[in-house]
Regions:
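Conserved catalytic-core segment of nucleotide-activated headgroup transferases in glycan assembly
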Residues: 1-25
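Catalytic binding pocket for nucleotide-activated donors in carbohydrate/polymer assembly enzymes
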Residues: 20, 45-125
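C-terminal alpha-helical cap of glycosyltransferases
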Residues: 122-145
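Short alpha-helical donor nucleotide-sugar binding micro-motif in glycosyltransferases
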Residues: 35-36, 41-46
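Short amphipathic alpha-helical segments and helix-helix/interface helices
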Residues: 39-40, 63-64, 136
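Well-ordered, non-membrane alpha-helical segments in soluble/globular domains
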Residues: 1, 96, 100, 129-137
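Active-site donor-binding acidic/aromatic loop of nucleotide-activated sugar
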Residues: 23-36
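A short acidic, often aromatic-flanked loop/helix-cap motif at beta-alpha or helix-coil junctions
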Residues: 10-11, 39-41, 92-95
Length: 145
């Protein structure tokens, strides 16, 4: 089953329904438009793979939630291309390869995935000493100290 969360408002839009119905999953009736839900509640019940496609929102907090939970994250965020299962831009063929890779290899590589995810999360952790130090340096440079 494919749950397309945060798409319920699009469910009656002709282009969206045309797109969904053009896919095998849409024709088979296994893709559904869903409301917006707290990620962890929904993921714990329904998610095997998280696919996040963004346009001008490459630091969406859902990426971090998926990484923190060790969910296989298939995404096109250039800011996180070294973690998860990255595909560039709007490249649907590369996205399909990334989804296949996540589905077939994630469990076998989970320990390395967790290490990579933790390293990525540490870069944005507001309590990490390195982040605090960099922020302090930038403030000092801005203030001329």
């Amino acid at each position: 089953r494919i749950y397309m969360t945060n798409t319920l408002k699009l469910a009656t839009h002709p282009l969206f329904t045309s797109f969904v119905n053009s896919t095998a999953a849409g024709r088979a009736g296994i893709a559904s438009a869903e409301d917006r839900y707290p990620f962890i509640d929904y993921a714990a019940k329904y998610v095997d793979i998280v696919v996040c496609h963004q346009w001008e929102n490459g630091l969406n907090y859902h990426y971090y939630e998926a990484l923190h939970g060790s969910y296989p994250l298939v995404h096109n965020s250039p800011f996180l291309k070294d973690v998860g299962y990255y595909y560039p831009d709007f490249d649907i063929d590369a996205a399909a390869v990334a989804i296949h890779d996540a589905a077939t290899n994630h469990d076998d590589n989970i320990e390395q995935y967790k290490l990579d995810a933790q390293a990525a999360l540490e870069k944005v952790n507001p309590f990490a000493p390195k982040v605090i130090d960099e922020y302090r340096q930038r403030l000092q440079a801005l203030m001329g100290d």
